[in-house]
Amino acid sequence: RMGASRLEYTICTAAGRAASLSMTGLVNEANIEDIPKMDVVILWATNLVTTGIHAMPFIEEARANGAKIIAIDPRVTRTTAFADWHVQPRPGTDAALALGMLKVIVDRGLHDEAFLREQTIGWEKLIDERLDDYPLDKVEAITGVPAADIEKLALLYGSTKKSFIRLNWGIQRHDNGGAMTRAIRCLPLFTGAMLTGGGLCVGTGNEMRGIDPVKLQRTDLLAGRTPRIINMIQIGRALEDKTLAPPVEALFVWNSDPANCVPDTASARRGMARDDLFTV
């Protein structure tokens, strides 16, 4: 009603959400409260010790129950230090790592063919047309992870249905973020991990927000108008652009930290420091 610009968001989840919807639709993800029942827990591209402490009691309980905790991350973090094993692929190569694991799982007959036939489509095409492209030596060359470690990881994960993957947002910010998400999501589908309460989850906390985006955005008030769209990752450019007409004169920030989390933080900070910008 005020004529405000709309924000194209989010910097976190767009690629992964699109990838997930293309594979599994709007289905419930695995629940972190089931982690204590797992034999293998993979913390993939996430730093839960620092940024997801609400999940850590469940992971610590799983370890106390004998679970193996694996962290997959190019970085060294507090979570990789906490894990029993740190696997370090090169940034952006997670899809190759996941497909290499899948090839080992299939070659060793660890996949749940009955589950795949009953609950999925396209799995035979993936095996016939793609997995042979990812032998261990090639995956090692792509990811930098030794072939023996890839095989060990695949066998550890594939040897039980009681497995849980906690995937995070970081990989989705690569140009192949959707492909990486899809490849990783194939792992619990091939092992049938969902049958034990395991599987994969990305968000651990969204269910607590209870936000209805339709009520929040109130598109019914547009009355046929098409508002200007500003991409969240370009907020700094929008705030600094002196040719933008009309200029952005007010900024409402909710549940976000653009001064620290957008790609060009220097530009965002300069824009937010404008004397003529009203920021809430």
Provide a role label for each language-model segment.
Residues R1-T196, C201-G205, L216, L221-V280:
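Cofactor-pocket helix-loop regions in the catalytic cores of large enzyme subunits
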